[in-house]
């Protein structure tokens, strides 16, 4: 029979040891030879660049690739979360019209740019979490605290991404960004159902294409992706539950780490999708990095940008898009760069 995460004949998803397909086993993400995968790096904005480049007439995939080169070759990251950004209209939340705002279902050139960026990252031997970050299909039902969840419309976007990257072993897929509210867990079951449906949409595309199941990251059920506890007793069921990772965003003091990721990581494969100097001190960040490495949890800093705080880069853009600017680390960036220089 077909084993979830493997190729249709049930054999190893990659053809042999050392090949690049990832899979989950127990509470870890592993490489083809069974070794625990040690992925770490940072978030990287797509061509929209945290709204910094949406107004420019041209689009700049080459700039995203240049920053990926810096992050991988110089800072020594081997894992990048590529944050996809789209809006409901050219003017939503903006005093002037954006030139670039449509999502992958409506802007073929944007999707092609994303493919070229992801191919570029993969050619360098790094993995990329292709993640919906700002997307108009996310639920916005603040009246019932369903904000930031994936919807049926989101699932259509995820299906397109799954088809686009179906044969790319270096790609992981992120369902959404940050489910908000639900601090008391009262909506956990409904949030879980939305996530499970999203994973099912991706698996349907993969199975139809006859390709291995990619790692899919589902986000914490509330508190801006901070709550993983429901998944401990209710792991995702779609696709047999295999090759699903559980993504948490951490901007808290070290005392909160057990409830945020340490406890969940005892039984679940966890990804820390964001962390950084916001409410955290440098000491808190260093504790997180040490604990993540000890527990073999992939982790991604926020963010390799100059105006999307907490910023890893100094703003040398003169307030613009930043094409060709010097990629100079901030103090936060230097802290991350120093840690990435230490082998894990």
Which residues does each PLM region occupy?
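A mature extracytoplasmic/lumenal domain signature
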Residues: 43, 84-86, 132-134, 177, ...
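Extracellular glycoside hydrolase catalytic/binding regions
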Residues: 21, 53-56, 60-61, 142-172, ...
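Short active-site-proximal "capping" loops at secondary-structure junctions
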Residues: 47-49, 85-89, 215, 223-224
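Localized chelating/binding microdomains
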Residues: 35, 40, 54, 67, ...
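N-terminal carbohydrate-binding accessory modules
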Residues: 7-79, 92-100, 335, 339-344
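Aromatic-lined substrate-binding rim segments of carbohydrate-active enzymes
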Residues: 58-137, 151-156, 164, 196-210, ...
């Amino acid at each position: 029979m077909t084993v979830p995460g493997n190729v249709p004949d049930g054999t190893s998803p990659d053809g042999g040891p050392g090949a690049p397909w990832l899979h989950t086993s127990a509470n870890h993400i592993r490489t083809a030879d069974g070794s625990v995968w040690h992925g770490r790096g940072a978030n990287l904005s797509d061509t929209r660049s945290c709204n910094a480049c949406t107004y420019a007439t041209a689009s700049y995939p080459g700039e995203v690739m240049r920053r990926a080169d810096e992050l991988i070759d110089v800072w020594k990251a081997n894992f990048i979360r590529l944050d996809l950004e789209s809006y409901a209209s050219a003017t939503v939340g903006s005093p002037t019209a954006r030139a670039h705002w449509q999502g992958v279902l409506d802007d073929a050139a944007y999707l092609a740019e994303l493919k070229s960026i992801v191919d570029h990252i993969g050619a360098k031997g790094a993995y990329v979490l292709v993640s919906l970050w700002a997307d108009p299909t996310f639920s916005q039902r603040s009246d019932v605290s369903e904000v930031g969840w994936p919807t049926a419309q989101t699932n259509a976007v995820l299906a397109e991404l799954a088809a686009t990257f179906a044969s790319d072993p270096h790609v992981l897929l992120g369902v959404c960004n940050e489910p908000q509210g639900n601090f008391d867990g009262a909506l956990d079951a409904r949030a879980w159902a939305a996530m499970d449906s999203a994973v099912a949409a991706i698996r349907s595309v993969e199975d139809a294409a006859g390709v291995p199941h990619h790692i899919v990251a589902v986000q914490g059920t509330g508190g801006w992706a901070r709550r993983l506890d429901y998944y401990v007793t209710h792991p995702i069921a779609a696709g047999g539950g295999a090759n699903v990772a559980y993504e948490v965003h951490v901007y808290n003091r070290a005392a909160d780490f057990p409830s945020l990721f340490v406890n969940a990581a005892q039984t679940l494969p966890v990804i820390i999708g964001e962390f950084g100097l916001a409410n955290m001190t440098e000491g808190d960040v260093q504790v997180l990095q040490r604990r993540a490495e000890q527990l073999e949890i992939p982790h991604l800093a926020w963010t390799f940008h100059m105006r999307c705080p907490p910023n890893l880069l100094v703003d040398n853009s003169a307030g613009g898009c930043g094409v060709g600017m010097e990629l100079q680390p901030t103090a936060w960036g230097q802290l991350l760069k120093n840690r990435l220089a230490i082998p894990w």
